[in-house]
Each structure stands twice: as C-alpha cells, then as structure tokens.
C-alpha cells in the first residue's frame, strides 16, 4: 500500500508507522505551521485555537512524559488533538490555491489576506490534492460517493473518536451506541467546475463514519453549488 492508496482508503496503520518515523516534534511543528493550534482570525467571537500536543505541552499539563503510543494516535488526528472546521477549510483551501493560508472572511468582495504559506513544496501539495481526487475516483476510495459528472471533487473522510468505548459497546453498530459516545464524522473536500472552485468541510457531531454520514451532506452541497453556477 503506497501513500496515495493509504490516503484514499484511509489506512490508519500506514499513518501509525509514518508518525512513528517522523516523531511528535516534527508532527507538531508542521501542524502549527500549517495553521492548526491557533486561531484563524475569522471575524466571529470566541474562536477556539484547537490543540496540537507535544512533549512540552503534556509535561506542563499533566506533569507526565510523552509516550510513544501518543505519537501514533496524534499522527491520525486522535488523542489530544482538537481542530475546528474552519481550520480544516483554510488548510484545504491552501492546498488548491498555491499554498496560501488565508484569513477566513464572512463578507463578500473582500480582498484575500494571506497570513502565511503552507510549509511544504508545491510537488507535495499537488500530490495531496491528487490523492484526495483519487479518494473520490478510486473504486476503493472512502469518498467515492462524491463522484459527479462534469466536476472534479477531491476529499478526505475522517472519524474522530470521542471516548474509548468499553467492551460493551466497541463492536456495536453506530446506532446501537449511546449518542454522546458516538464518533464524530468529518469530510473535508474541494470541488472544481469550469472556473468555479469551492471548499466544503462538514462535521457531524456524534455522526459516526465520515463517509456515510458527512459524505451525503457534502454531495448535496456540491450539487446545489454547481446547479447554481450553471
């Protein structure tokens, strides 16, 4: 399984191994430079910074040393990691706009404000966007339900664990698990058609699987957007 297929099929084990090789310092440094763990500056009150953990944070917060197992779960965005939909949207926007991390705006006709650049080479940024497109177009891609005629969609599904489930619940279907214990469902995406481009990020709290819960919402949004454009 190569990196593109690991992204397309959402293979946690691949990223466990990659995270172990990179180490928590490299992971946390990249995430912060990519805009996570800090406010985006959107003109809304009470924006959350989210959290990108590292060894120093854990020692200060809990008085305990960092454990190797915490690195591998951080590598897939679990554990102590918290992010917001607008942070994810800004990151995806940077993937498709040349690497510019923009301050999110609610007003129309406002000139974009570049805050910083993604800390990656263009070839790596383009590889990620192509892998997200592959996630939609591949027969085994977790976002294959987003395929549309006359439009190019790229996406990444996500499932964020809320709590560690007890043996009583861990093998149950989502609908059989108490609501507040269910995973959060994510889908981050971009879409192109003619001269129009969009970023759509959906979080369904306690929604279970990203592909089955957030996916249909994302597709409905694109169908509306592209109908409006035409």
What is the predicted function of each stretch?
Residues 1-201:
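Beta-lactam-recognizing serine transpeptidase/beta-lactamase-like catalytic domain environment
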Residues 208-209:
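Short beta-strands and strand-coil junctions in structured, solvent-facing domains, enriched
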Residues 112-116, 129, 216-230:
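Short, gly/Ser/Thr-rich active-site loops of penicillin-recognizing serine hydrolases
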Residues 84-90, 213-220:
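Short amphipathic alpha-helical face segments that pack within enzyme cores
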